[in-house]
């Protein structure tokens, strides 16, 4: 009887389909002057290595000011600051993304072969976005952004690109 139960358990486990494998590919990060915690944006790939059409990009915290663990963005962070809107590019070549707190700058998430990258115009040139840095202080009605820095690499030359944006 025990042997029959053991085989039943093994066969039951083998008959359950495995969850689809989801891989991620780092796109860019947002660092802030407030603390060492970093928001990561990753491309989410299906088992065959293509951008996941259901959820092509994910965002989450890496809590470096604490113990380095990963945490999800909370509702307010998603709706007011670090969340994003994403939709398929009309050309069919990737996705168009805007970070909620800065919708003026559109980011294109594009896949070429195995590589996935976030493309953005930095200082007038198309570039691969690597990092944003936000210098801000706490104000009475929320954060007061002093400036934003964009860091990346020129798409054509591979040289480093930088732009400092001071809100008006």
What kind of feature is each model-predicted range?
Residues 61-127:
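Mature extracytoplasmic domains of secretory-pathway proteins
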Residues 21, 167-168:
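Short, solvent-exposed mixed-charge patches
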